[in-house]
Structure formats: C-alpha cells, structure tokens
Curated annotation (Swiss-Prot):
This is GTP cyclohydrolase FolE2. NCBIfam families: PRK13674.1-1. It is an enzyme of class 3 (hydrolase). One of its GO terms (molecular function) is GTP cyclohydrolase I activity. Belongs to the GTP cyclohydrolase IV family. The record marks 149 as: May be catalytically important. InterPro entries: GTP_cyclohydrolase_FolE2 (IPR022838), GTP_cyclohydrolase_FolE2/MptA (IPR003801). The keyword Hydrolase applies. It comes from Pseudomonas aeruginosa (strain UCBPP-PA14).
Amino acid sequence: MNALTLPDIARQTTTADLPLDWVGMQGIALPVQIGGQRVAAEADAGVSLDDPQARGIHMSRLYLALAELEQGELDLSRLRAVLQRFLDSHAGLSRRAYLRLRLAPLLRRPALVSPLSGWKRYPLVLDTRLEGDDFQAEVHLELTYSSTCPCSAALARQLIQERFDQDFAGQPLDHASVLAWLGSSAGIVATPHSQRSSAHLRIGLAEDCIGLPLEELADLGESALGTAVQTAVKRADEQAFALANGQNLMFCEDAVRRLHRALQGYPQASRFSIRVVHAESLHAHDAVAESHWQRGAA
C-alpha cells in the first residue's frame, strides 16, 4: 500500500487576489530568560501575506522559530534573529515580520532605609518588527508609584495653621509645648490625600541598543518620580516613604513632565510616549496626562 502525501492546504492559491497586513498567532505560551530569571511569557507572532494569490502562511514555522527564544538571555539580537527566521521560512510570501512578547519579570528592590528587600513585578511588553534591514523594537513598561496632591497638601497645612492659632492664642510659646503639640493628633489635624498611581511608558529603542534595559528604565523612571511603591518595609522605611511623598508632591502633569525629562536624556531612547494615571482618592474618576517625544523631531 502506497503512503499518502499529507495535504498542505496553505500552499493552495486563492482567487481572492488580496494581500494581508498581518497573519499569525496570538497568546502563545513561552518561557524566556530575562535578567537571569526564567519568566513565563505570551507571544503574538505573525508576518504579512504579500502574495495576493497565496491562500495562507505556514503558522507552524513561526511557532517552531520561537524556540530560539528559550536558548539564552532575551536580547534584541535574539529577537531579530527570530524575526529573520519568520521571513526566511516565508520567502516569496512575506516582507514584514512581527513579534510581541508580554511578560512580567521580577526585580528585587531594596527598602528605603532598612536592609530589607523584596520582589516587585514589572509588567512589560516587547514589540518588534522587521522589514528588510529595518528592525524596530519598542518597550512598554508600567511603573507604580504614590502621588500626593499639592492642592490637598496646601489645604491641610492651612488647617494645621488654624488649629495652631486656636490652641496657642494668647499663650506664651515655648519650644517644648510646641514640639509636643506637633507630635500629637491635635496638632496634625489634617493630612493630604494620596493615591497609588501608574506610569505607562512606551519607548522606542535606538538602533545600537543590544540588551533589554528593563532595570535601567525602571531605575530611571522611579528615580525621577521619587515615590515608587515599596516591597518589604519596617517603620523607618514607612517614615522615609512619608517624607518622600511630602517632598515630591505631584499633580499628574508634574509626574509626566518628570518622566519626560528623564527619558529625553536617556541615550538608548529614539522616541517615547508617556501616559500617567492618578487613581484619585478624592474623586471617583482618574486624573491623566500624556506626553510624546521623538529624537530629532522639531
């Protein structure tokens, strides 16, 4: 009995005569290595279908090419090599290749004062594409931080002044009594409102960038904001965090400008967009600000 040749329907032609921008798969489970740790990722992989008469692409070839990402540290050269394999396996069919990775690596972050440290998750998306020799890579990174409202802080200070005036009206002031008053609940009669906030960074990486600068970008953004959310803390760390919030009062406009200035000076960024969201504790809605920049643009 002769063995039958398995049919390959993707090789058939179509009468539709229409090229397609993107064909592929999304949500592919994949382990990758970043920063020396194994991380679960999801991949979206695809190519353009430029032959208008080709019925489809060979999705299994894309899937198998992704195995290269398991072989070592994830970097831009490895991502580019995978995209090139996408195109090589679709010669005559495709001119553009795309790959998106979604992952949430962990970074160990130190406490502000004490020797404690803990792990913090950084949601990350890597978008890459290749067309000819044109390789583009973009990092989407989310940072969380605390934002204390400058207006609320001013109103709280005014209430403290008024209470001080009431409690000490007509009395001679001495250092000990004022110090005791400032440390009492009667003295700090009001506090400003603050909230957990998020910054969504989309950064186009320069052509000469090789590695994935996750920790660099996280450090850069958190340093600019000054109030990154913490992991393990003692009371001394919590006090230092309260001080950081008091010294870094921020509207959403302030936060996005801080990040803009920091990223503008980052040499590996060719372009970026920033969106900050302050999940208001005073209001039932969010305060949002955005900024965009491209190197060399007027």
